[in-house]
Amino acid sequence: MRKVYVIPTYHCNLKCPHCELHLKEDNFSEKFFKILDDIKSPDITLFGGEPTLYRERLKRCLETEKISSISTNLLILDAELISLYKYYGISIATSWNPKRFTEEQYKLWVENLRKLEENGLKCIILITLTEDLLSYENFNLLLKEWDNIESIEGILFEPLLDYQMSRDLHERADLWICSLYDEWNFRIRNLIADKVMKWDCNCSDVWTLNPNGQLSRGCPQFEKKFVLNECLGCNLAGICRPCHLQHICSFPKNLYKKVLENANLASSSISARA
């Protein structure tokens, strides 16, 4: 198993508009831990829902010493959790989107990012490319604020998965990311600029362990699989292994061209100096 998402609960303390996982029935079973004990994978992520909601489930997962990372909204963070993350060497990912937090929740989230910093822990921020993000004013001001929080190592922008979305959303998101890429002048890494050079969304060996103990093939969002006709003859097939859950091409082609051009320019500059 190349990658496994382990979901101790679907319950969540947020109701993000682009996420429907919290609507699923939890139906937790002790079978969950029996299956987790048998799983062998180099990359196991605690996912949800919000995996920190039920402390004993979380601790039992970590005690297997198989968990490598956690995806958390970071609204729950205390001395015990910090100690657990440090002891088990857990990589942390958290998320932000314009409609994710109330004002008070956002303040708490930033406080907890600073707690990570104070305790020598690092994280990345995941941001879904939603309509409201593309129209969000003064996003650069947020980036400047986050750039001063040493716990934040990088930001990864991710394509929205929504079968009701506008058909040109991914194209507009690509152009939005390109504009941001041109202006990027921060300590924080823009991780999609790295990912776009090897866009591997292949989920053939990705699995999800659900709270009821069912182990299913695919990521937590898996519903149905699409094979797009445009992918079959695409000249970027060697670079892009697409997400088969997307019903519209989500590969940021314009960003890929920009990053490739910059890499070629940098290579030419090094060769000229040699």
What is the predicted role of each segment?
Residues 1-31, 242-249:
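Canonical Radical SAM [4Fe-4S] cluster-binding loop centered on the CxxxCxxC motif
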Residues 32-47, 54-158:
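Radical SAM/AdoMet-radical enzyme domain recognition
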